[in-house]
Amino acid sequence: MKKRVWRTIGFGLSAAAGTLCAMSAHAQTSVQIYGTVDGGVRYQTNAVKGGGTVVTMNSNGYYSSNKLGFLGKEDLGDGWNAHFQLENGFNLGNGQFDNTTGIEFNRQAFVGIGNDKYGSIDLGRQYTISHDIISIYDPFSFHFTPILPLTTASDGTRNNNDIKYKNVFGPLLFEVDNSLGGVAGDFSSGATRSVGMSYSAGPVNVGGVYGHRNILTGTAYLGDSYYMAGVAYRIGPVRVSGGFMSEDLQTPAAPHQVTNNAFGGISWTITPSMIFDGGYYQTTVSNDKASRRGLSVISLAYLLSKRTTLYSEVDYTSYKHAVVSTLNPAGTSSQTAVTVGIDVLF
């Protein structure tokens, strides 16, 4: 009798353990901690009107932005998953946040659900679609963002209260989003809506973005339309890429402010551990006194390992008019700069 009871109990425990193991295998959960620590020194001429030079350390990172992030994912079965991402930026020099408003997860903060076939829907603070697509066509792949003009010209870098759908249909990457403005009685004010695509076929990439937002300027919300087109082609270790971006801010008291950015360049993988990048970026602003800015950049990155990179960069900026303006804060005719540093991933 006792043997039969113990046999029954043992069978029940084994069945329960098997069920728990099956549930564990069915619902795999992972949380990854990641980040970047980047320290660089930059020498720049004509940093102020009158020709003064300056040596600085951008503690937010040159080659990559300094960040600390948490990436979580739970397997829900049948190709479905729940996921989240929290990411903040920090100042390497003093350990503080890289923003003055004290936002803890200022870089990214979103949660969503995804499927291998049907794509993902994410909600929260996220990169804009223009940011996602432009990074594919930037010759520097969005390295040196404090120096290059693309992130600040990409229809905003991030959206708050954003609902984004993303999927890959074979060779086509497709994204669409709606950032809620949160203004009572007005669905448009403060809102951003955009759509973007990038098509990849062998060595060729072609993509574009269109977006419209109503941004608060002073006490009024102004319409702001944006579009971008990019193309890239790979020839062995060399990738040639470029694009054009245009933004139309509908100012009420004056002609619209139109900002155009054209860019192009190459990325050459000389060896698996050495990468050369070069590019030219031209920005024109219709109502800016400086009118036009041209930026030429070359860089060399040496990978000590998969996680550690030594980098150097030289850039030259010229202005059509040497006057103080938003486009030309120092009011100089040209500037030359050199940057060196180290970038570590974890």
Model-based region annotation:
Residues 28-43, 55-181, 189, 198-202:
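Outer membrane beta-barrel
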